[in-house]
C-alpha cells in the first residue's frame, strides 16, 4: 500500500506538475517555477529513497522513517494551505488544474484537486500506518 502511494509521489506528481499548468506555465515567474521543480524533485527523491528502504533494507526502523518522511510532505502541504493568506497564495491558477465538483445530498461542492489528492494520500498513509503499527503490537 505504501509502495503504491510512493509510486504516485514519484510518477504522478511530476506528470501533473512538469507541464504548462505548472513548471512551464507562462504566467509564473521563473523563480516560482524553479521552486516548484525543486519541490517536485525532492518529492521524487524522497519517494524513491522510501521505496529502496521498504524493499531492499526493510526493517521496523526504516518503515517508520518512510512513514514519517512521507507524512512530512502531507503535513507541509496542509501547513501551506493554512498559511495561504500570509503570502497571498492560491491553491490554483486560472490556467491550472480545474477543481472537482461533487454532489452530496443534492448540494454541489467544489473541491480543489490538490486538496483531494493530498487528502487521499493522507488516508492511504494513515491506513497503512495503522496496519503496520497494529501488526507490530499483535506479534
Question: Positions of the model-derived regions?
Answer:
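Core segments of alpha-helical transmembrane spans in multipass integral membrane proteins
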Residues: 33-54, 71, 75
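Juxtamembrane boundary at the C-terminal end of a transmembrane helix
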Residues: 129-139
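Individual transmembrane alpha-helices with interfacial aromatic-anchor signatures
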Residues: 103-123
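Interfacial segments of alpha-helical transmembrane regions
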Residues: 1-6, 58-73
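Interfacial loop at the N-terminal end of multi-pass membrane proteins
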Residues: 12-37
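Interfacial non-cytosolic loop connecting adjacent transmembrane helices
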Residues: 25-34, 87-108
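C-terminal TM-helix exit segments that contain a strictly Trp-centered aromatic cap at the helix terminus
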Residues: 11-17, 75-91
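Core segments of transmembrane alpha-helices
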Residues: 42-50, 118-127
Amino acid at each position: 500500500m505504501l509502495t503504491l502511494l510512493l509510486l504516485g509521489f514519484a510518477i504522478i506528481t511530476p506528470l501533473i506538475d512538469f507541464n504548462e499548468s505548472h513548471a512551464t506555465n507562462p504566467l509564473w515567474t521563473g523563480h516560482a517555477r524553479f521552486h516548484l521543480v525543486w519541490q517536485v524533485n525532492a518529492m521524487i527523491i524522497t519517494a524513491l529513497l522510501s521505496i529502496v528502504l521498504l524493499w531492499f533494507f526493510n526493517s521496523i526502523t526504516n518503515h517508520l522513517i518512510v512513514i514519517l518522511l512521507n507524512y512530512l510532505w502531507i503535513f507541509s502541504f496542509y501547513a501551506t494551505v493554512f498559511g495561504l493568506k500570509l503570502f497571498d497564495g492560491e491553491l490554483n491558477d486560472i490556467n491550472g488544474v480545474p477543481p472537482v465538483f461533487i454532489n452530496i445530498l443534492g448540494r454541489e461542492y467544489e473541491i480543489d484537486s490538490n486538496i483531494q489528492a493530498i487528502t487521499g494520500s493522507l488516508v492511504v498513509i494513515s491506513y497503512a500506518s495503522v496496519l503496520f503499527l497494529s501488526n507490530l503490537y499483535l506479534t
